[in-house]
Amino acid sequence: MRINYLDDDDLAFLPECSEAHLEAFTRILTHGENGKPRLSSTLLRNETFLAMEGHPERYRRNWQLIAGELQHFGGDSIANTLRRHGKFYRAILLDVCKRLKAKVDKQLSTPQIEQQLLAHFLQHSWNKLNAEQKAQFLAAVECRSHELDSLMAHLLRHRKLSEGVTLLLDERLTAILRTHAAVSVIGHGLVRGAGLNSVKAVSGSAYRVTIPAVLHIACLRQMLQPPSDTAEIGEKYPARS
């Protein structure tokens, strides 16, 4: 299967990531939470990607195919077919911000918007956890502080941001998607009889893929930054309610 990758400056950093980190990110795109391959994945049917199975740099050498897969999932499925490619990452990022109700400044750079999204997600997810879940989370990321600002700094300082976000997604993604599904049903009712306006509501972005994928991309970018740059995320870009 052919994957048409849009040349995207916001994804050009991917080959700088470690092979292990890229493999973990790719699995978000290609496999569901139950571990089963996604039927909608084009990457798992791509001959070039399949031919490199077992190669020590399979993911880094195919980063454009992986990025194209994300763009594919971020675009409207019908529109993808017509234009033969997906959406730029920034558009996907802003779409996820809207879905998670993260109020971000669209005039900022993509990395800055990602930082606002991460701060929003960590704050709101943390507040939804019960005492037992918080204790399990803190133990998993090896943090003793229950204060959110200290937790953010800890995740960044010890390079556990991706792990922390993944753990929170395991707890919160189902609830997030349930809310999205309810909104979608209401939306479908509102646009019924509106002709082509209803098509986008039915065939829109695959949020089960794009929400964790965008959060993971944001983590990967943060982890590549020097500690002095990442330590300010909680202070410089507090979650906006």
Indicate where each model-derived feature is located:
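Short, Lys/Arg-enriched charge-dense amphipathic segments
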Residues: 104, 111, 129-138, 195-217, ...
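Amphipathic, membrane-inserting segments
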Residues: 1-30, 204-241
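N-terminal leader/propeptide segments of preproteins
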Residues: 1-128
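Membrane-active amphipathic alpha-helices
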Residues: 117-156
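Phosphate-binding glycine-rich loops and adjacent basic patches that engage nucleotide phosphates
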Residues: 54-59, 131-139, 177-180
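Membrane-inserting effector segments that mediate pore formation, membrane fusion
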Residues: 146-208
